[in-house]
């Protein structure tokens, strides 16, 4: 009984710890940021994830097909065939979430690091030209209404996203004597995240085991004190019978 109590307590402590076998997911980082480029643009994907000592190999997948084992994956001149889903994995990480690459054909492309923003986040839109040709008289539009004009090619910056920034955006500018427009991109602004119990989800697999251990601990403790009372009562009964025997003539 004395040995059972400490072992149960140790099991309770161990059950609260995350499993050491769970590996973090690798993360794909793209340069330039976002997932929209024009043909002949260069793109670099970097895989963030731990590797065993002395082993720096990385698995790169394009649409599910293994394409490289280098630390990073470089596309020198993008083509439409490079569009698709990219994932990576290192020696001490799980396969990353997919990152989409869209390779577009055109003179201008509206680039954004993401299409869904939370309220309060900054928004940066860039009017990118094919082969980085100079662009003049750049205009940015939201829902076909002009929002910004510049003689040079400067970005459209919104310090804090609000609901009125939802909409369809595109840019227009002069490349030489050509008046070109980009395709439209839908920008979505979401409200602030609602607090929830999702942070507890990683620990749900451990909760049933912890509950069982707690019940065992309670039962063991109850048995221990019940045994102590039983021994104490037995000892008192034995002492009383001994005293009564000495008083006989």
Curated annotation (Swiss-Prot):
Cellular localization per UniProt: Cell membrane
Superkingdom, natural source: Eukaryota
Cystine residue pairs: 47-88, 127-171
Site residues (Important for receptor turnover), renumbered to this chain: 220
Residues carrying a glycan: 55, 63, 166, 179
Extracellular side of membrane: 17-198
Membrane topology, as annotated: Single-pass membrane protein
Signal sequence segment: 1-16
Name of the protein: Low affinity immunoglobulin gamma Fc region receptor III-A
């Amino acid at each position: 009984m004395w040995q059972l109590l400490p072992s149960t307590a140790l099991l309770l402590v161990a059950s609260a710890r995350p499993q050491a076998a769970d590996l973090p997911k690798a993360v794909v980082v793209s340069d330039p940021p976002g997932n929209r480029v024009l043909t002949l643009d260069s793109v670099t994907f970097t895989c963030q994830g731990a590797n065993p000592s002395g082993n720096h190999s990385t698995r790169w997948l394009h649409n599910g097909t293994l394409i490289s084992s280098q630390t990073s994956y470089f596309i020198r001149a993008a083509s439409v065939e490079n569009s698709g889903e990219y994932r990576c994995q290192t020696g001490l990480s799980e396969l990353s979430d997919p990152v989409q690459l869209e390779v577009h054909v055109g003179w201008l492309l509206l680039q954004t690091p993401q299409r869904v923003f939370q309220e309060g986040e900054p928004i940066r839109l860039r009017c990118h030209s094919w082969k980085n040709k100079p662009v003049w008289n750049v205009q940015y539009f939201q829902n076909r209404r002009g929002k910004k004009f510049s003689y040079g090619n400067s970005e459209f910056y919104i310090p804090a996203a609000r609901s009125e920034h939802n909409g369809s955006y595109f840019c227009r500018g002069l490349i030489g004597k050509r008046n070109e427009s980009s395709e439209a991109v839908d920008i979505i602004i979401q409200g602030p995240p609602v607090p929830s119990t999702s942070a507890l989800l990683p620990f749900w697999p451990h909760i049933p085991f912890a509950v069982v251990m707690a019940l065992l601990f309670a039962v063991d403790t109850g048995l221990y004190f019940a045994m102590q009372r039983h021994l104490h009562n037995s000892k008192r009964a034995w002492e009383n019978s001994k005293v009564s025997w000495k008083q006989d003539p």
